[in-house]
């Protein structure tokens, strides 16, 4: 928030959506919907200080879905049914019988997405079989490595987590869109703030669905940064979002035009209610969103 009370951080998102609609190049895409696209627009930056949580206010965002999906990633899960049973249907399309058959996964059960995000974060390099197999101790646990480096060598320039594993693409229902995150610790000057170091996260996202996906991704990685900061005893700093192919699906244009006319309100606050020490101990009930006052929900169809 700026001194004049305007939410400039949400405005940067809305300005980019408008620019894509006005100036974007038409591109056909794998879903058959078609998009307007810009490549490598300016980064989006969001402060996470003072418990600020960059949850868009110009439409109501499915906060519970964001939290449950991230917990699902962190658990290394790849079974979309585990989310669907909790009312989070965002992966149902990519895990449907029709979609899996179309992708050549006729022997997989419905919901088995293959070695997607959570598997790569927690078991990079392990041999994937099914979503029901136990991969404990297999592959590289990138998330645990990130946390260890933050605790032992916070100046390290290799505090990185990647979901991009070309060796596994032929097993994935959908290759990752948000693929590469780097964490950076800054140290306060003497007498500044709480005195604790600040943790920031930079995300590179190759494919950026501005209408549906990007609002989710912003909040999800802001939440991830908050959770990691909690377990390493740091303060949250900033989330920086680097976008590759930033696109608006043609059937989202009218909805986004409506959203752009709305005035952003102050971002809510995110409170973590327990003193969690282990990244694997977080639960849905640990999080509380305060002062979220969004405009009404805007329906947009997901292209699969």
From Swiss-Prot:
Entry's localization field: Nucleus
A Pfam match: Thymidylat_synt
Disulfide pairings: none
Keyword Nucleotide-binding set for record: no
Activity regulation note: Inhibited by 5-fluoro-2'-deoxyuridine 5'-monophosphate (FdUMP).
EC number of the protein: 2.1.1.45
InterPro entries: Thymidate_synth/dCMP_Mease (IPR045097), Thymidate_synth/dCMP_Mease_dom (IPR023451), Thymidate_synth/dCMP_Mease_sf (IPR036926), Thymidylate_synthase (IPR000398), Thymidylate_synthase_AS (IPR020940)
Biological function: Thymidylate synthase required for de novo biosynthesis of pyrimidine deoxyribonucleotides. Required for both nuclear and mitochondrial DNA synthesis.
Similarity section: Belongs to the thymidylate synthase family.
Protein name: Thymidylate synthase
Gene that this sequence comes from: CDC21
């Amino acid at each position: 928030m700026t001194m004049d009370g305007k939410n400039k951080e949400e405005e940067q998102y809305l300005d980019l959506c408008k620019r894509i609609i006005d100036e974007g190049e038409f591109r056909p895409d794998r879903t058959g919907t078609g998009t307007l696209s810009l490549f490598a627009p300016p980064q989006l930056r969001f402060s996470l200080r003072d418990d600020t949580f960059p949850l868009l206010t110009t439409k109501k965002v499915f906060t519970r879905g964001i939290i449950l999906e991230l917990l699902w990633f962190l658990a290394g899960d790849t079974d979309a049914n585990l989310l669907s049973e909790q009312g989070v249907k965002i992966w149902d399309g990519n895990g449907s019988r029709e979609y899996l058959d179309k992708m050549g996964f006729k022997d997989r059960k419905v919901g088995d997405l293959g070695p997607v995000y959570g598997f790569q974060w927690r078991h990079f390099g392990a041999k994937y079989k099914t979503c029901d197999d136990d991969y404990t101790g297999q592959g590289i646990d990138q998330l645990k490595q990130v946390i260890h480096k933050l605790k032992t060598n916070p100046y390290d320039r290799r505090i990185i987590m990647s979901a991009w594993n070309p060796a596994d693409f032929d097993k994935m229902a959908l290759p990752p869109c948000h693929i590469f995150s780097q964490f950076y610790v800054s140290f306060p000057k003497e007498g500044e703030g709480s005195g604790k170091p600040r943790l920031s996260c930079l995300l590179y996202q190759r494919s950026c669905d501005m209408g549906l996906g990007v609002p989710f991704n912003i909040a999800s990685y802001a939440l991830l940064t908050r959770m990691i900061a909690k377990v390493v005893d740091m303060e949250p700093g900033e989330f920086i979002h680097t976008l590759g192919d930033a696109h608006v699906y043609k059937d989202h244009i009218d909805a986004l035009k409506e959203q752009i006319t709305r005035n952003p309100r102050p971002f809510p606050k995110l409170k973590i209610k327990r003193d969690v020490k282990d990244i694997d101990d977080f639960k849905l009930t640990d999080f509380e969103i305060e002062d979220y006052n969004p405009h009404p929900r805007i329906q947009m169809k997901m292209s699969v």
